[in-house]
């Protein structure tokens, strides 16, 4: 790969990192072509972009964005790496867990950046999967706001039935 090609890839990765709220780092080494194709198809269906990138180019892209990536330098940026980009924090984690349920251990979660916070290690995958999306939070808030109104309406409805029965 020439320096010009590397510079283009670094620029692309930097733009994707800057434009996405979340990126995950995975290890897909040892996956068969069929497994990779199935994983990419699943990513596409969930709106997640998956791209295999050399660690040195990921580091340079992060440096270009002035992001302190020292938390990722350990296990996350060693070995083969694939990047997953998403605007919803929990979607890549849920996607990885769903793919693993099919009996495939790879791609393996190595680390993630969620709203500029780093999560490194396999043990963080469950926590990331449990993060609620914006839509889920809005739904919870609406349900909480509707509950008192529904109680009042229910109470008024019961009162009107009692009044109608007495009349």
Curated annotation (Swiss-Prot):
Coiled coil: none annotated. The keyword Ribosomal protein applies. Transmembrane segments: none annotated. The keyword Magnesium does not apply. Keywords: Ribonucleoprotein, Ribosomal protein, RNA-binding, rRNA-binding. InterPro entries: Ribosomal_uL10 (IPR001790), Ribosomal_uL10-like_sf (IPR043141), Ribosomal_uL10_bac (IPR022973), Ribosomal_uL10_bac_type (IPR047865), Ribosomal_uL10_CS_bac (IPR002363). GO terms for cellular component: large ribosomal subunit. One of its GO terms (molecular function) is large ribosomal subunit rRNA binding. One of its GO terms (biological process) is translation. It comes from the Bacteria. Belongs to the universal ribosomal protein uL10 family. Part of the ribosomal stalk of the 50S ribosomal subunit. The N-terminus interacts with L11 and the large rRNA to form the base of the stalk. The C-terminus forms an elongated spine to which L12 dimers bind in a sequential fashion forming a multimeric L10(L12)X complex. Forms part of the ribosomal stalk, playing a central role in the interaction of the ribosome with GTP-bound translation factors. This is Large ribosomal subunit protein uL10. The gene is rplJ.
């Amino acid at each position: 790969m020439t320096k010009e090609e590397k510079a283009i890839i670094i620029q692309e990765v930097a733009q994707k990192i800057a434009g996405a709220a979340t990126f995950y780092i995975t290890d897909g080494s040892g996956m068969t072509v069929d497994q990779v194709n199935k994983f990419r198809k699943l990513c596409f269906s969930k709106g997640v972009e998956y791209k295999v990138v050399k660690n040195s180019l990921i580091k340079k892209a992060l440096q270009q964005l002035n992001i302190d990536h020292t938390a990722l330098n350990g296990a996350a940026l060693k070995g083969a790496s694939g990047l997953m980009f998403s605007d919803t924090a929990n979607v890549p984690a849920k996607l990885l867990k769903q793919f693993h349920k099919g009996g495939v251990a790879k791609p393996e979660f190595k680390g993630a950046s969620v709203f500029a916070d780093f999560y490194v290690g396999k043990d963080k995958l469950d926590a990331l999967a449990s993060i609620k999306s914006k839509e889920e939070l809005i739904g919870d808030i609406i349900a909480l706001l509707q509950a008192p109104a529904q109680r009042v309406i229910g109470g008024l409805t019961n009162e009107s039935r009692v009044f109608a029965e007495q009349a």
